[in-house]
Amino acid sequence: MKIHHLFQPHFRLIYLFIWGLIISGLSDLTWLIPLNVLAVSLFFISLQFSQKSFLPYLKRWFALVIFIVLMWATLSWKIGENGIELNFQGIELAEKLSLRTHLLLISLWLFLWNINDAVLVPSHWQIAFARKINSTFCADRTLHCTAWRIASKNGYCHARSWISSSA
């Protein structure tokens, strides 16, 4: 197997999934901060070499920053015995979550570098468990549609009986 085969889109999705699991298990700031610095550095180096525009990435990153600010706004305080107090556990959790989400976003950009939607959509079918997930999704969707039809028919029948009984 040649080395470039290991960087095919479906393998990148698998690597990204495993990396996401690793990131979600990290809780030590001495690991999260250097990994964020490394990921951002690699991202900017990749941008420099490919000569892509930073603007689309900046818009997505700004949406993440808004989410992180809202997360900090909700986790950094609590209502205690003396009214509103600082929540030090919440601040610590907000630090970890913001570093994790930032690392996940930058990692997503790096792992899916130069992959557009036309390549990404067919690549998930090459993963072994994708068929099972898609079958489950289709079965769930069918069940939803059937339940909706039954509920709408029952509602229609109930409405007809209500109309006929009131007339």
UniProtKB/Swiss-Prot annotation:
The keyword ATP-binding does not apply. One of its GO terms (cellular component) is plasma membrane. It is a multi-pass membrane protein. The chain crosses the membrane at residues 13-33, 37-57, 61-81, 103-123. Keywords: Cell membrane, Membrane, Transmembrane, Transmembrane helix. Its main location: membrane. This is Uncharacterized protein HI_1620. It is found in: Cell membrane. The keyword Membrane applies.
